[in-house]
Amino acid sequence: MSAKKIVLKSSDGESFEVEEAVALESQTIAHMVEDDCVDNGVPLPNVTSKILAKVIEYCKRHVEAAASKAEAVEGAATSDDDLKAWDADFMKIDQATLFELILAANYLNIKNLLDLTCQTVADMIKGKTPEEIRTTFNIKNDFTPEEEEEVRRENQWAFE
């Protein structure tokens, strides 16, 4: 017997047929399955097909890793390392895609993907000056020098 399939529909009208186990990585979709609301497909108005394909790729890999870990307990450390390496490679994406993935992971309530994407942004910020952060994320400085100084004084602990 084949695994049950669920159809996910992106905001731009593309449909993706995925195994239920993969779709259940999303708590949002899991609740819809519990409520028996997936027979005609799951519309995801906040997720484009490009991002949904990435989300599905991530969920598939993590479901496969969990299944292989359950089968072979001895090699578990190796599979964890492999998954971490895969995650690191998966995060080698442009900023726009990264930010869209964060929004999708949040909307779909996929905690591990949200943690991974947010950690990636945190790593991009770590150890940088405010000016370097602005450059990295293309943020315009709209503070006056006085306002900037006031923020530095109020948050002195963060600059130590």
Curated annotation (Swiss-Prot):
It comes from the Eukaryota. CDD domains: BTB_POZ_SKP1 (cd18322). GO terms for biological process: auxin-activated signaling pathway; chromosome segregation; ethylene-activated signaling pathway; jasmonic acid mediated signaling pathway; microtubule cytoskeleton organization; negative regulation of DNA recombination; protein ubiquitination; response to auxin. Coiled coil: none annotated. Its main location: nucleus. The keyword ATP-binding does not apply. Keywords: Auxin signaling pathway, Chromosome partition, Cytoplasm, Cytoskeleton, Developmental protein, Ethylene signaling pathway, Host-virus interaction, Nucleus, Ubl conjugation pathway. Accumulates only in meristematic cells. Expressed in inflorescence, shoot and root apical meristems, as well as in developing organs such as gametocytes and seeds. Also detected in cortical layer and epidermis of roots, leaves, pith and vascular bundle of young stem, young floral buds and organ primordia, pollen and through the valve of siliques. Not detectable in mature root tissues. Pfam families: Skp1 (PF01466), Skp1_POZ (PF03931). InterPro entries: SKP1, SKP1-like, SKP1-like_dim_sf, SKP1/BTB/POZ_sf, Skp1_comp_dimer, Skp1_comp_POZ. GO terms for cellular component: cytosol; mitochondrion; nucleus; phragmoplast; SCF ubiquitin ligase complex; spindle. It is found in: Nucleus; Cytoplasm, Cytoskeleton, Spindle; Cytoplasm, Cytoskeleton, Phragmoplast. Pathway: Protein modification; protein ubiquitination. Residues 102-160 are annotated as: Interaction with the F-box domain of F-box proteins. Belongs to the SKP1 family. Involved in ubiquitination and subsequent proteasomal degradation of target proteins. Together with CUL1, RBX1 and a F-box protein, it forms a SCF E3 ubiquitin ligase complex. The functional specificity of this complex depends on the type of F-box protein. In the SCF complex, it serves as an adapter that links the F-box protein to CUL1. SCF(UFO) is required for vegetative and floral organ development as well as for male gametogenesis. SCF(TIR1) is involved in auxin signaling pathway. SCF(COI1) regulates responses to jasmonates. Part of a SCF E3 ubiquitin ligase complex composed of SKP1, CUL1, RBX1 (RBX1A or RBX1B) and F-box proteins. This is SKP1-like protein 1A. The lineage of its organism: Eukaryota, Viridiplantae, Streptophyta, Embryophyta, Tracheophyta.
